[in-house]
Amino acid sequence: YYMIQETMTVGDFLLFTLLLSEVNPPFDAGNDGNLLLARVDKLLEFGALDPAAALLDQAGPEDPALFRRWFDVSLLIGREDAACMTMQSNPKITLSLPARIFCLARQGDWNAAALTLNSAEAIAALSDEELALLRHFLESELPNEKEALPSPITPLVFKLTEAVGEPLPTFGLPLAFSVTDI
C-alpha cells in the first residue's frame, strides 16, 4: 500500500493515516461495529488490502458483516482456504450460497457443492448469472457462449472466473481488485 500513498492527495493521505491509527471508538459510537466497518470499507476503497485484513483479523470474523468483508479480502489476497475453513467451522456466519458452494468445492466436497447448487436452483435462491457461473465452476465444461456475469462483480465472482480460466481484467473494477495484477 506504499504505492497508494505516493499517488494520494494530501487530504486522502491524512484520512489514510487516520484509518491506520490504533484508536478506541468514540463513547457514543455504540457496540454495533459501524466505525470499524467504515474504516475497513474506506481502506478497501483505497485498495489497501493488507491493512484492511489486519484490522479484520484483529477484530475477528465472528460477526456476519465483518465476516463478509474478511471473506472478500481473503479471496483477493489469496487466503481463500483460511476463509473457507472459518466458514466451515461456523456455518451460521454467512447466508451466501455462492460462498458456501465455492468453499465446499475448494475443500474437495464436490458432491455437497453440487447438491447445494442444485437445491439453490430448485428453490430459485440464485440469479441466473450466479447459477451459470457456479455450474461452470463445478462442472468445468466450456460454456457454449459467453455467459453474463452477476452484477456487481464481487471478489467471489472475480475468483470464480479466475478459477474457470476466464480471469476478468481489473480495469474498471474497484482498486482493491488490482492487487491481483501485482
Where are these regions (language model features)?
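Alpha-helical solenoid repeat scaffolds
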Residues: 1-182
